[in-house]
Amino acid sequence: MRPEGSLTYRVPERLRQGFCGVGRAAQALVCASAKEGTAFRMEAVQEGAAGVESEQAALGEEAVLLLDDIMAEVEVVAEVEVVAEEEGLVERREEAQRAQQAVPGPGPMTPESALEELLAVQVELEPVNAQARKAFSRQREKMERRRKPHLDRRGAVIQSVPGFWANVIANHPQMSALITDEDEDMLSYMVSLEVEEEKHPVHLCKIMLFFRSNPYFQNKVITKEYLVNITEYRASHSTPIEWYPDYEVEAYRRRHHNSSLNFFNWFSDHNFAGSNKIAEILCKDLWRNPLQYYKRMKPPEEGTETSGDSQLLS
């Protein structure tokens, strides 16, 4: 018999087998990629400098393929979480129905006595609701701990794909309309994006953008925080941008010349009207599965000259 108040989440056997299968597939892909990379590097040594660019392109493609597998694992974890929550809700609903059937309904009541009875039921219900909230919070924390190693691994692999986040942000259907050529150049110095969510005591979404040295600003990390409720993301805190003197005047001009919502205005002015829209896209869409917006580049063919931009794969 389970202790009173505890919840049991059963993961279906087909999901457990599918998760293990994804793990073995990712492990096999890593081993195969390592063997292919070794053979490719041996050829690169023989062919000289002309083979270096091809090797870099191949390694970047391997990293993107590995990201596919990591995203599959993250999706399996998310699916397990949904199934566990659904099964827990069904179990609690069935228990409530059985309890309701066991208690005889009240007889004819006056409005005054009905309100008194309703108050008594509500008082009894409050500790049950509190217990359910605690159980749900514990389950959510457990699933977040399971997701973390996959997200850490994804971040490490992304480091092997130059310009990954700039590519993803620029190719998002909604973000692309908000990005100028100058924004794209600024984003080309972005090396990583991280999103953290806190549920207690308030729901907070923290966006962290990491940059390498660039001609625009001195910051290595820019953090933006938003309070989240059912209807909106509300600006809470932002790291002040330390513009270089040579660009400070241009930054001021850009910020005041264009009053419409765009990436630069969101980036430079935390309280800009409509900036919560960009925050929501980053937190709820791009962070959860960035690979769906990544446009892969065709590696240069042997014997052809490499141009500044490789051809996009359709």
Curated annotation (Swiss-Prot):
One of its GO terms (biological process) is gonadal mesoderm development. Gene3D superfamilies: 1.20.5.1500, Nucleosome assembly protein. It is found in: Cytoplasm; Nucleus. Keywords: Cytoplasm, Developmental protein, Differentiation, Gonadal differentiation, Nucleus, Spermatogenesis. Disulfide bonds: none annotated. One of its GO terms (molecular function) is histone binding. One of its GO terms (cellular component) is cytoplasm. InterPro entries: NAP-like_sf, NAP_family. Belongs to the nucleosome assembly protein (NAP) family. PANTHER family: TESTIS-SPECIFIC Y-ENCODED PROTEIN (PTHR11875). May be involved in sperm differentiation and proliferation. This is Testis-specific Y-encoded protein 4.
